[in-house]
């Protein structure tokens, strides 16, 4: 059982670091380059969420104590972050590609989506760290 745990944890950490790191960077740069990173970010988000759910199954099955409640808050924040990036950022990027939106307005929406997601992913990271010691 250790090999699946190690592989899942590694995939979770790598995808989460890319997702959060790129979100923090795009939030800081005003979303500049967001259209190029949208698909990789959403791919990393899917992998992070799926591996996180599987880790919950492997490590926390049958228990819902304080640590699991903290992890649930973090998981919810990650889901909302993915939704914000997908809905707000994705629509803005799609309108840029179609040429149907004001470029400044679309870039502003991308930046806002990344800033909201960055805060939510910071909450997620804090929850993962705190759950370890709960």
What are these regions (language model features)?
Residues 1-134:
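Polytopic transmembrane helical bundles with strong interfacial aromatic enrichment
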């Amino acid at each position: 059982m250790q090999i699946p745990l190690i592989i899942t944890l590694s995939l979770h950490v790598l995808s989460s670091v890319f997702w959060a790191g790129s979100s923090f960077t795009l939030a800081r740069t005003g979303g500049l380059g967001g259209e190029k990173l949208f698909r990789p970010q959403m791919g990393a988000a899917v992998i992070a969420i799926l591996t996180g759910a599987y880790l919950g199954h492997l490590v926390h099955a049958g228990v819902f104590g304080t640590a699991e409640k903290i992890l649930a808050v973090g998981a919810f924040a990650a889901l909302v972050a993915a939704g914000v990036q997908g809905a707000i950022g994705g629509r803005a990027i799609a309108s840029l590609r179609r040429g149907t939106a004001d470029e400044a307005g679309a870039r502003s929406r991308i930046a806002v989506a990344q800033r909201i997601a960055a805060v939510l992913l910071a909450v997620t990271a804090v929850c993962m760290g705190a759950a370890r010691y709960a």
